Amino acid sequence: MSSVVVVGTQWGDEGKGKITDFLSEHAEVVARYQGGNNAGHTIVFGGVKYKLHLIPSGIFYKEKICVIGNGLVVDPKALLEELKYLHDRGVSTDNLRVSNRAHVILPYHLKQDELEEASKGDDKIGTTKKGIGPAYMDKAARIGIRMADLLDREAFKEKLERNLAQKNRLFEKMYDTEGFSVEEIFEEYFEYGQQIAQYVCDTSVVLNDALDNNHRVLFEGAQGVMLDIDHGTYPFVTSSNPIAGGVTVGTGVGPAKVTRVVGVCKAYTSRVGDGPFPTELHDEIGHQIREVGREYGTTTGRPRRVGWFDSVVVRHARRVSGLTDLSLNSIDVLTGIPTLKICVAYKCDGKVIDEVPANLNILAKCEPVYEELPGWTEDITGVRSLDELPENARKYVERVSELTGIQLSMFSVGPDRNQTNIVRNVYEA
């Protein structure tokens, strides 16, 4: 039995999709365990670039089972659009499985998300307005509608009527806007469910059977540790648990069945949306990193905020996610910058802090303590091993591994699959 979890160690957008796609080649099952279509991942397969939001990266391999686990919230309309997107490009989706316990995003979740974000004014958290938060709220409040309900005409109608009575009062009384009628949603979304039905099953059985039969299973996280609802920069976070512990809850696989946890990070830092960002760059170097690294959101198209590598953040990710392996991406983006900086600690009110403060007022006051390293000018996009890296690039990579306390297993020098290099095999380590 070999199972590997891929976790983002920063604020998402670390290149998890590419690494998951790369590792998918040697897995028999690929599963997502949290989030929804608020996360985007870009995969290059057969020379073609694909952008996915819900469906796991392994979908391009016909012989591999791809799982949307119970921990996700699924917009049926968005899922069908993504299926069509793949079908139109000749990609089969017969290998997809969707949990019958996954919760469903409905139009009132999208409306609630938009209205709540608008009402916060300057205190907005930067939601993607995909209905993710409200769907997870309903799940916690035990009024959510699950895939199993969507496929049952009577159950779906009964729960939809109950929920709309509540949601419409919210829209009218709190936001002074009209809600929805049952007729506006019911038939359309029930039909969506019927189109998805062929994929729906108990995915916990699928995953545990695979592991019991010694198949390699790859668990694919969305977002990143710093967006985790418990361990991220709350409240500027997502509504689920991207940390490795989210796998057990979000797929129905016990923790003893997870063997390796790969932390994916960039050689610098980026984030979309609001919230504290200690190493953020507002200068010409920041602009250069953003343009060279094409730092614009896959889902939103928003320019990402960028900054120096923050080892405090990645050490935090190592601790709360139990990271065993490091995958360092986008090293090539730093080429040509004369002096590179790595944040090794924070300083606040004269005190040195080695961990991420839970209090955001304190985090906002934190000044990064930097260590400087010389940059490199050589083109590294064709490098295929650590030894081929220029001395300064190799020293930078090694220092990142030392400061984070995570053994380097993979590094990437460009966006293509063949620019990802293996230092050690995570399935056999």
UniProtKB/Swiss-Prot annotation:
The keyword Repeat does not apply. It comes from the Bacteria. It comes from Bacillus cereus (strain ZK / E33L). The keyword ATP-binding does not apply. This is Adenylosuccinate synthetase. The gene is purA. PROSITE patterns: ADENYLOSUCCIN_SYN_1, ADENYLOSUCCIN_SYN_2. GO terms for cellular component: cytoplasm. Plays an important role in the de novo pathway of purine nucleotide biosynthesis. Catalyzes the first committed step in the biosynthesis of AMP from IMP. It is an enzyme of class 6 (ligase). Binds 1 Mg(2+) ion per subunit. Mg(2+) binds at D13, G40. GO terms for molecular function: adenylosuccinate synthase activity; GTP binding; magnesium ion binding.
